[in-house]
Amino acid sequence: AKYKNHPKETNEKRIKNHLNRAFNREQPMETLVSDLTYVKVGGTWHYICLFIDLFNREIVGYSAGKNKDANLVSKAISRINHNLEQIKLFHTDRGKEFDNHLIDEVLETFKIKRSLSTKGCPYDNAVAEATMKAMKTEFVKQMQFENLEQLETELFDYVNWYNNFRPHSSLQYLTPVAFKNLHMKTV
C-alpha cells in the first residue's frame, strides 16, 4: 500500500480541547476518539474512519469509502453497536469532515460534548493516531486492495481481530474485549 501527503482543511470553530490528553477513562463508551486515514485501492485513494472507545481502546465504529467527508464519518457512527446516550465526549482533530450539520445533529440529539485537538497538535488525539498507525502497519501495508468491497471486507476482519485477539500494553496485555469483559465482572 502506498501513502501520500493529503493537506486537509481544518475546522476553525472555537471548540475547546475538553479531553486535554486525559486518555484513560473509567467507563466503557464514556469518551470516543476518531480519526481518518487514506489507503490506495485499485490505483486511487480511499479513506478509512475509525471510532475508538478510550476505556478499552476498542474500535467501536468504522467505515471505508472513496471520499473523505461527513458521509464517511456518519457511516462509522451508524456502525457503533452501543447506546449512543452513554457517550459523554467525542474528540477529534480539526478535520473538516467532522465539521458537518449531520454530525452536529447526532451529537446534539444524544447530548454528546464535542472536543477538538489544538490545531496542528496530533498529540491531543494520540490514541486515535496510534490506532491508525497500528492499523497501517498491521493491516494496510500487508494488503493490496483491488476495490472498495475488498477493503470493506478486509477492514471488517481486521477490526474483529484488533478487538478480540490483539493484546494491548495499555490494557495489561489484554485484548479490548477481554479488558471490557473483566471490568464488567468486577463492577
Name what the model sees in each region:
Residues 1-27, 121, 175-183:
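Basic, flexible linker segments flanking DNA-binding modules
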Residues 8-10, 92-103, 114-136, 149-156, ...:
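RNase H-like two-metal-ion nuclease catalytic core shared by retroviral integrases
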Residues 19, 35, 51, 57, ...:
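Mobile genetic element proteins and their domesticated derivatives, centered on retroelements
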Residues 21, 25-60, 66-67:
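An active-site-proximal beta-strand-loop segment
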Residues 44, 62-84:
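Active-site beta-loop-alpha junctions of metal-dependent nucleic acid enzymes
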Residues 56-62, 115-117, 141-142:
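Short small-residue beta-strand/loop micro-motif enriched in glycine and branched aliphatics
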Residues 108-112, 136-187:
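C-terminal domain-tail junction helix/linker
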